Curated annotation (Swiss-Prot):
Residues 1-26 are annotated as: Disordered. This is Gene 34 protein. It comes from the Viruses. Residues 1-11 have a biased composition (Polar residues).
Amino acid sequence: MDSPRGISTATGDAHAEAAVSPAAEIQIKTEAPDVDGPEATTECLDHTYTQQTSGGDGLDAIDTDDLLEMVLTSENTESEPGIPFALRGNFICCRDDNCRACRELPFRPSVIGFSRDPHVSMALDMTSGNWAYVPRVFPDTPTAPWMANYCIPDLDEHAD
């Protein structure tokens, strides 16, 4: 059975997979491009995040482009025009040749164990009480105004 793009199921049945792992509400799937397709020459991987639907009857895919747009929309619009990922300090961008997370691979995974992707961190939204993906932060990342509503464990971790 084919799964819709972005849904990560080992058995092919989203209902059975959700029942097997109720604690894993957020799953990460990395897809390599088809070898036969024209995209085979690119070295980028498609990082697609999935989360369990509120009804518990399946998984919704969250594309990283949508994630990026949500973060940039929520941040003030004082960034420089033309930069695809305009965040300050030690935030990183997978499109940046100087990407700190890419340079430091294999990166130190989060102690809380949520995300193994070097380009995102998990943060607790203090207004809604939900966990959300935010662009990767490091313990020495300077604070920004948008962080006021989030508890970001990666900011509190000590470098190894």
